[in-house]
Amino acid sequence: MSKATKRKHVVKEVLGDYVQPTEHQRIVKVLGSPGNNLHEVETSEGERFLASMPTKFRKNIWIKRGDFLIVDPIAEGEKVKAEIAFILYKDHQRLLQKEGLWPEGFTQDKTGVVTKENENNGIQSTEALSTAQAKEQGEDSETDDDSGLFVNTNRVHYEDSEEESESEEESESEEDEEN
């Protein structure tokens, strides 16, 4: 099988299939990638370990920090305790939440930010922040903010401040008065 055909089938499998975890599999969140196709993950209970990426996903599917995975446990592993079985995208996450298979440790607030529940007092750790963020977002929507726009990094960006432009206008008006 050629590389292009393999890539096509792997991508189709990951994006198209809706997989439910078996009793041995776990849903984990990616914390980072130390390298060599290993990913540091955290369970909903807070346990951290490394998960290896199988060869069928390597150079075909990319995993970034904050993504969710379904992993198969490896019994003989000391540091690497799991192997990635499936990558969960937003559609997969919504489906698992509707079916009640989503771990209670990972919750989503209205803004779509995934947070970890605070186990000490049983409330979300970002509950107070989410209401403050909602108020700020309401205020931000009233003003025009270009921070979300695409920035072309191939061009030199000159930043003019209002103070500089005012001082330039003053110096120009002084020069005009002298002439």
From Swiss-Prot:
Organism: Xenopus tropicalis
PANTHER family the record matches: RNA-BINDING PROTEIN EIF1AD-RELATED, TRANSLATION INITIATION FACTOR-RELATED
A Pfam family of this chain: eIF-1a
Protein's UniProt name: Probable RNA-binding protein EIF1AD
Location in or out of the cell: Nucleus
Biased composition (Polar residues): 120-134
InterPro entries: EIF1AD, NA-bd_OB-fold, RNA-binding_domain_S1_IF1, TIF_eIF-1A
CDD domains: S1_eIF1AD_like (cd05792)
Compositionally biased intervals (Acidic residues): 160-179
Family listed: Belongs to the EIF1AD family.
Record has RNA-binding as a keyword: yes
Any one GO MF annotation of this record: RNA binding
Predominant location category: nucleus
Location of the S1-like domain: 14-89
Role summary: May play a role into cellular response to oxidative stress. May decrease cell proliferation.
Keywords associated with the record: Nucleus, RNA-binding
Gene3D superfamilies: 1.10.1200.180, Nucleic acid-binding proteins
Gene Ontology CC terms, in alphabetical order: nucleus
UniProt key word Hydrolase: no
Chain spans, region Disordered: 117-179
